[in-house]
C-alpha cells in the first residue's frame, strides 16, 4: 500500500458517489478482518453521509492528486451517545468525536492523518468501536487512547468507548 501526503477538507455533495465507494470498501475490509456486523445493512447510508455533509461534520482525506481515499465524521461538543457510559471518561472537558472512519485501502496513513488533524482541532477526543473491530482497537491503543468503558450506540449495540487527552508529542 502506497503512502501519500493527504489533505483533509470538509466533504461536499459532489463527493457523495466516492464516499459511498470508500465506505463500501471499508465495510468489506471490516468483514474480511473479522468484523462483519459493525456496519450492517449498508451503514453508513447515503442519508447518513448527506446529513454529515449538511451539518458540516463530514470530512474527506484526499491525495495530492485530489483523489478521495478516506472519510470520517468529526464533531465538537457533546455527543448524546456518550452521555451514559458503563465506566468513567478521563475528562468531562469539551471534546471532539470521530465516527465513521473509512479508508479506500489505496494509501496508508489515513487513520494517523485523521487523528492528527482532529487533535489539532481539540486536544480531547472520544471515539468508540465494536468489540469485533480488532483493527481499530489496536490502532486506538497504538495512538495512546485509553479504554474508558462501554456505551450503547445509536443502533442499540454496545461499543468500547475510548478517550485520549493530547498533551503533545
Per-range role (PLM):
Residues 7-21:
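A short beta-loop-alpha structural element at the N-terminal edge
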Residues 27-47:
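Conserved GNAT-fold acetyl-CoA-binding loop/helix
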Residues 47-60, 78-79:
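A short helix-loop-beta-strand connector motif used in the catalytic cores of GNAT acetyltransferases and
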Residues 60, 67-77:
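Conserved beta-strand in the GNAT
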Residues 73-106:
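Conserved acyl-donor/pantetheine-binding loop and adjacent beta-alpha core of acyl/acetyltransferases
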Residues 103-120, 138-142:
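Conserved acetyl-CoA-binding loop-helix of GNAT-fold acetyltransferases
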Residues 121-132:
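Conserved GNAT acetyl-CoA-binding A-motif
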Residues 128, 146-160:
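Conserved catalytic-core motifs of GNAT/GCN5-like acyltransferases
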Amino acid at each position: 500500500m502506497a503512502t501519500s501526503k493527504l489533505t483533509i477538507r470538509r466533504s461536499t455533495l459532489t463527493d457523495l458517489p466516492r464516499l459511498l465507494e470508500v465506505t463500501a470498501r471499508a465495510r468489506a475490509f471490516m468483514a474480511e478482518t473479522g468484523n462483519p456486523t459493525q456496519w450492517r445493512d449498508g451503514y453508513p447510508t447515503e442519508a447518513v453521509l448527506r446529513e454529515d455533509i449538511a451539518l458540516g461534520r463530514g470530512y474527506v482525506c484526499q491525495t495530492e492528486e485530489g483523489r478521495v481515499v478516506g472519510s470520517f465524521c468529526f464533531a465538537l461538543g457533546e455527543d448524546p451517545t456518550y452521555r451514559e457510559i458503563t465506566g468513567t471518561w478521563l475528562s468531562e472537558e469539551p471534546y471532539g468525536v470521530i465516527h465513521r472512519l473509512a479508508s479506500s485501502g489505496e494509501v496508508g496513513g489515513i487513520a494517523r492523518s485523521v487523528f492528527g488533524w482532529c487533535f489539532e482541532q481539540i486536544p480531547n477526543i472520544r471515539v468508540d468501536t465494536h468489540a469485533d473491530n480488532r483493527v481499530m482497537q489496536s490502532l486506538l491503543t497504538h495512538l495512546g487512547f485509553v479504554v474508558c468503558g462501554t456505551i450503547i450506540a445509536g443502533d442499540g449495540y454496545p461499543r468500547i468507548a475510548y478517550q485520549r487527552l493530547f498533551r503533545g508529542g
